[in-house]
Amino acid sequence: QRQMCIRDRYDPAAGSGSLLIRAADEAPVNRQGNAMVSIYGQEKDNATAGLAKMNLVLHQKGTGEIKTHSTLTSPQYLDEYGQLRKFDFIVMNPPFSDKSWSDGITPENDVFHRFDGYGIPPEKNGDWAWFLHVLKSLTEDGKAAIIMPHGILFRGNAEETIRKQVLARKYITGIVSLPANLFYGTGIPACIVVVDKENADDHEGIFMIDASQGFKKDGNKNRLREQDIERIVQTYNLRREIDGYSRMVSYEEMLEDNGGNLNVPRYI
């Protein structure tokens, strides 16, 4: 049993703060009923950051911090040595396939060493840049849930090199494939990538769930129903393998038999 101490939640692409607030709502509470959590977010757009601050206040989380600036160019949460501050839990839904991710930085000489040992993401696609920022921002036993487009699971070249390096370190422990048309502003199907740095050497594989078919149509959007969410959570927590829906896949199978390709339909 983990001792009751204040754990922090961080969202490097905070937007209006809704994901951060939901993550904070899941934190344990103390005897006085106060959540044992500190909240930190960064959002580059001034107006959106203002909205996030207001959102925190409206949800009784006014002590949460939202800082403004581009996270990849100018991360605002640093330690006393000028390196990235480490967080226990990170949630993030970054801009998909961010074409301007490297504006203002020289990735080869990144002062925060986010790409060391992994490789440089493609100039016009920042999906892995955001992912590697999260990895570098996690404590030694830190955990993260990141919403990403499916492309990061199988695209080749520089991204394949990075993906294989991440796989070799056994940091990814879960992938949940979601229905298309779930998010505003994009019809691209997304997935949740679960990261766990704690005792990574002991991890056996990635637990994959294909939840792409469980949804309700709502106008031109798709929505996850309560039962869809419940099924995902139950299956994931129990690591229950269900034919055509979920499976534990070993790192060896992914790296040796499939060249580091993590596309969920390949395995389920």
Model features per residue range: what roles?
Residues 3, 7-92, 97-106, 112, ...:
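Conserved S-adenosyl-L-methionine
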Residues 84-268:
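A conserved structural/catalytic subdomain of Rossmann-like adenosyl-cofactor enzymes
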